[in-house]
Amino acid sequence: MTVEKIEAQLTNLEMQLTFQEDTIDSLNKLVTEQTQQMSEMQKQIRWLGKRLKQMQENQSTDSDPADEPPPPHY
């Protein structure tokens, strides 16, 4: 191999490395953002689960439908 070919290969490898480093940085930022989004969604799901449970408990503690007077058409 000539010196020129070795230098060209080295330059090519350096460019590939730079591109890969940039890609890794971009992917790392994306993973970080998605992790934050997932954490927020998990909080929202927990809140919704608690709210649903409260609503179900409130419904079950309401008066018995048999205790209510019949509708006016009876």
Curated annotation (Swiss-Prot):
Coiled coil residues, start to end: none
Pfam families for the chain: SlyX
Domain of life: Bacteria
Disordered as annotated region, ranges: 52-74
InterPro entries: SlyX
Family listed: Belongs to the SlyX family.
PANTHER family xref list: PROTEIN SLYX (PTHR36508:SF1)
The protein, known as: Protein SlyX homolog
Organism of this sequence: Idiomarina loihiensis (strain ATCC BAA-735 / DSM 15497 / L2-TR)
